[in-house]
Curated annotation (Swiss-Prot):
This is Peptide chain release factor 1. The modification N5-methylglutamine is found at Q245. One of its GO terms (molecular function) is translation release factor activity, codon specific. Peptide chain release factor 1 directs the termination of translation in response to the peptide chain termination codons UAG and UAA. It comes from Polaromonas naphthalenivorans (strain CJ2).
């Protein structure tokens, strides 16, 4: 393990002792929000401390076994036993080292959150809209595999199938590392290019078209309050498309415009105007915050060009080549020849590879910061 990681872990142990003291302080106990935040931090720090203690214990076992081996020159049985313990300890240490590195990667608080996924058809006309429908199915089937909940917020179907635009909300529990839907899918943001022979193509020529995907974290309920109601224009209209006649009899669809930025969000899927307004407000808030995040990411990118990129939807991140059965993620040079399986929702290999690549980036950044730049 690199020295800077061990120093970071030592600081984590000190922080755990601080948290023990803070959580028993009367002023903290009486402040519910602070108490909850510190309790969550304590739980995460405890997991790290437990793993670190296991690591140091196995390192001690390794040192002891190596001493035993050095002293067992004339005792083959003892030497064999020592070698077995050395091999077992080294295996455990490598696994614990890797797990601790993942735990030390700085956490984005938004990774725990639900996500809005916006899929928009781009260049390629009808074929692009059909591919937007394919991406919609990919993400919904991936969500089904994870037992996540999927909700359509708004949709604009195309005439030949697929979507001109569709917005989903996906929610589900966090994993053991505290990563939720947004943390899993955040790296899907960007330009997705498809190469295939359209069903309407009689000459068998391969066409290229594209869609854009934006993945936004659902904002905290308290954040939405910070938007000035005077800055909003709220319009109601009759829903079209999905929803049926029952919705079309009333002006239940809602469109909200944030006047200072011109950002618009709408929802027409619910049966009540109140419910649609609440969902549209969540999407609007997420888009406003994403604009702020993108501006900050652009500033950061000017100083450091990350491998994964800023998540800007103009970045071409991936190519889906159907004739070759190939998916290529250009950010990390990942190529998989199981495109049809992936399009049925088997996205885990892609998601994991992107998370590992980003984790390696963050560890390098952490090391640079610890070394004083």
């Amino acid at each position: 393990m690199k020295p800077f990681l061990r120093h970071t872990l030592d600081r984590q142990l000190l922080r755990l002792h601080e948290l023990d003291a803070l959580l028993s302080a009367s002023d903290v106990v009486s402040d519910l929000d602070r108490f909850r935040a510190l309790t969550r931090e304590h739980a995460e720090a405890s997991v790290v401390a437990e793993q670190y203690n296991r690591l140091t214990a196995r390192e001690a076992d390794l040192a002891s076994a190596e001493s035993m081996l050095a002293e067992a020159k004339n005792d083959p049985d003892m030497a064999e036993m020592a070698e077995e313990e050395i091999n077992a300890a080294k295996t455990d240490i490598a696994q614990l080292d890797e797990a601790l590195q993942l735990m030390l990667i700085p956490k984005d608080p938004d990774d725990r959150r639900a996500a809005f996924i916006e899929i928009r058809a781009g260049t390629g006309g009808d074929e692009s809209a059909l591919f937007a429908g394919d991406l919609f199915r990919l993400y919904t089937r991936f969500a089904e595999r994870k037992r996540w909940q999927v909700e359509i917020i708004s949709e604009s179907p195309s005439e030949l199938g697929g979507y001109k635009e569709v917005v989903l909300r996906i929610d589900g529990p966090t994993d053991a590392m505290g990563v939720g839907v947004y943390g899993k899918l955040r790296f899907e943001s960007g330009g997705h290019r498809v190469q295939r022979v359209p069903a309407t193509e009689t000459q068998g020529r391969i066409h290229t078209s594209a869609c854009t995907v934006a993945v936004l974290p659902e904002p905290d309920e308290t954040v939405a309050i910070q938007i000035n109601p005077a800055d909003l224009r709220i319009d109601t209209y009759r829903a079209s498309g999905a929803g049926g006649q029952h919705i079309n009899k009333t002006d239940s669809a809602v469109r909200i415009t944030h006047l200072p930025t011109g950002i618009v969000a709408e929802c027409q899927e619910g049966r009540s105007q109140h419910g649609n307004k609440a969902q549209a407000m969540k999407v609007l808030t997420a888009r406003i915050h994403e604009k702020e995040r993108s501006a900050q990411a652009a500033k950061d990118a000017a100083m450091r060009k990350g491998l994964i990129g800023s998540g800007d939807r103009s970045d071409r991140i991936r190519t889906y080549n159907f004739p070759q059965g190939r998916l290529t993620d250009h950010r990390i040079n990942l190529t998989l020849y199981k495109l049809l399986t992936i399009m049925e929702g088997d996205l885990d290999d892609v998601v994991t590879a992107l998370q590992v690549a980003r984790g390696a980036e963050q560890l390098n950044e952490l090391e640079t910061a610890n070394n004083g730049g």
